[in-house]
Amino acid sequence: MPGHLQEGFGCVVTNRFDQLFDDESDPFEVLKAAENKKKEAGGGGVGGPGAKSAAQAAAQTNSNAAGKQLRKESQKDRKNPLPPSVGVVDKKEETQPPVALKKEGIRRVGRRPDQQLQGEGKIIDRRPERRPPRERRFEKPLEEKGEGGEFSVDRPIIDRPIRGRGGLGRGRGGRGRGMGRGDGFDSRGKREFDRHSGSDRSSFSHYSGLKHEDKRGGSGSHNWGTVKDELTESPKYIQKQISYNYSDLDQSNVTEETPEGEEHHPVADTENKENEVEEVKEEGPKEMTLDEWKAIQNKDRAKVEFNIRKPNEGADGQWKKGFVLHKSKSEEAHAEDSVMDHHFRKPANDITSQLEINFGDLGRPGRGGRGGRGGRGRGGRPNRGSRTDKSSASAPDVDDPEAFPALA
């Protein structure tokens, strides 16, 4: 019925790989114990003191092997104590010598708490039945790639293999980023597309209706290329170089191996070319000494000339009788007096000498007496009356025309 929830859920908790770690005991010791037991059984039928001593020695070796097995208990057995019923059976079996584990169905007891003995060496597994693995939808085997490393394009998105954790899809490093989801989405809702060589138009042409372009094996523009390209490109260049070198050697060998008696009638153009080549070959690198090289450099270098006047060059004879003139002290003093008079000359109506300007009167107002306002404040209010008297005495009256005689 729709909307009806499933009542029960199951989950497998046991470790299916637990049997892989069942290798604490040494198999060689187990085999030796089995051989000793066989010898003891064979020597028991023959009477005599020698047989008894051999049986005692075999029993001693068996006890030593059993003690070693008890010491080699794993940490898993210590952490998971066995139930009382299994512990009793285990104690009984420890008294007996160990038997080789070659027979099918016989395993070491006490390895897992959910297994119990039944009869002789038979183990009952009381674990819950495992659920069958879920069938993956749209799962198909991977298609084998071609030689050029081409990817299959005509396959629809639904038929691609599941890209879960450890899935078969082409993810980063062979493992998909989606947490077990096979639809190409990861946990953040971001879709991750497969990487194809070429453009997206050719990859999804059967969906978008565009013209399909065949792959070119990874070659051409807008393609990544194939792995074989790097391996095949380098030998080509090597073969070309080798072929050119061999061709030059073959030509030289042919010219050397021709006998002197044979006559050659080459074309005129070829003779001219050969002569030019010989002339070029004869001209080797020029060798010269250091002095010769410096002489060539000095010839090519441009000489710099300066028009420098020599001493007493172009001297005029009329200036030979000249001498230095010094000013007298009286003239210097008179010049200074004239400068001072000119600088301090005053007009007749200048009244600046009559004005008295005292900048100290325009300063801050004086502080009041101590103890003002309850005897605590230092800065009492200033005496306004004295301030007004001083300002009225110093400041001229603007309305009085006699205060400004120059303006009258």
From Swiss-Prot:
Record's keyword terms, sorted: Acetylation, Cytoplasm, Isopeptide bond, Methylation, Nucleus, Phosphoprotein, RNA-binding, Translation regulation, Ubl conjugation
GO biological process: negative regulation of translation; PML body organization; regulation of mRNA stability; ribosome hibernation
Tissue: Expressed at high level in the heart, skeletal muscle and kidney, and at low levels in placenta, liver and brain.
Posttranslational modification: Phosphorylation by MTOR inhibits SERBP1 and relieves ribosome hibernation.
Key word Thylakoid present: no
Chain positions found as Phosphothreonine: 226
Protein function: Ribosome-binding protein that promotes ribosome hibernation, a process during which ribosomes are stabilized in an inactive state and preserved from proteasomal degradation. Acts via its association with EEF2/eEF2 factor, sequestering EEF2/eEF2 at the A-site of the ribosome and promoting ribosome stabilization and storage in an inactive state. May also play a role in the regulation of mRNA stability: binds to the 3'-most 134 nt of the SERPINE1/PAI1 mRNA, a region which confers cyclic nucleotide regulation of message decay. Seems to play a role in PML-nuclear bodies formation.
Region Disordered, annotated ranges: 33-292, 328-408
Protein's name in the database: SERPINE1 mRNA-binding protein 1
One annotated GO molecular function: RNA binding
Crosslink (Glycyl lysine isopeptide (Lys-Gly) (interchain with G-Cter in SUMO1)) position: 52, 102, 228, 281
Biased composition (Polar residues): 240-253
Cellular compartment(s): Cytoplasm; Nucleus; Cytoplasm, Perinuclear region
Biased composition (Basic and acidic residues): 70-80, 89-114, 122-162, 183-199, 261-275, 282-292, 328-342
Chain positions with Phosphoserine modification: 25, 197, 199, 203, 205, 208, 221, 234, 330, 392, 394
Subunit structure: Associates with mature 80S ribosomes. Interacts with EEF2/eEF2; interaction sequesters EEF2/eEF2 at the A-site of the ribosome, thereby blocking the interaction sites of the mRNA-tRNA complex, promoting ribosome stabilization and hibernation. Interacts with SPIN1. Interacts with CHD3 and TDRD3. Interacts with ZDHHC17 (via ANK repeats).
Modification Omega-N-methylarginine, positions: 165, 188, 216, 364, 367, 370
Pfam families per the UniProt record, alphabetical: HABP4_PAI-RBP1, IHABP4_N
Bias (Low complexity) ranges: 51-68
Stated consequence of mutating residue 281 to R: Not sumoylated
Principal location listed in the UniProt entry: cytoplasm
GO CC, alphabetical: cytoplasm; cytosol; extracellular exosome; membrane; nucleus; perinuclear region of cytoplasm
Covalent cross-link site, Glycyl lysine isopeptide (Lys-Gly) (interchain with G-Cter in SUMO2): 102, 211, 228, 281
Gly residues composition-biased segments: 164-182, 363-372
Family membership: Belongs to the SERBP1-HABP4 family.
InterPro entries assigned: HABP4/SERBP1-like, HABP4_PAIRBP1-bd, IHABP4_N
